[in-house]
Amino acid sequence: MSRSLKKGPFVDHHLLAKVEKAVAIKDKKPVKTWSRRSTILPEFIGVTIAVHNGKQHVPVYVTDQMVGHKLGEFALTRTFKGHPADKKAKR
């Protein structure tokens, strides 16, 4: 179920302040955040945000097609190591 339109998109205030500051001084360093739940706004376009995936910060360069999605969608938390090999096929 999506969020109500009258509420608007959710963005952590500290993340919004960091991004606005980075845009104002034209800083190219990634903005480090743990806020995977924040929605990407049009103000974030062109900024690299380092999103925490539980182990490390994954750099995410925000483009116009990402607007409206959550930051956590672009920093995967699970790694797939593959299914175990079939023992019958090894013979």
Swiss-Prot record:
Gene Ontology process terms (BP): ribosomal small subunit assembly; translation
Keywords noted in UniProt: Ribonucleoprotein, Ribosomal protein, RNA-binding, rRNA-binding
GO molecular function: rRNA binding; structural constituent of ribosome
UniProt cross-references to Pfam families, sorted A to Z: Ribosomal_S19 (PF00203)
Gene3D superfamilies on file: 30s Ribosomal Protein S19, Chain A
Ribonucleoprotein in keyword set: yes
GO cellular component: cytoplasm; small ribosomal subunit
Coiled-coil stretches: none
SUPFAM superfamilies: Ribosomal protein S19
Function: Protein S19 forms a complex with S13 that binds strongly to the 16S ribosomal RNA.
Recorded family membership: Belongs to the universal ribosomal protein uS19 family.
Name of this protein: Small ribosomal subunit protein uS19
Organism: Leptothrix cholodnii (strain ATCC 51168 / LMG 8142 / SP-6)
Protein encoded by which gene: rpsS
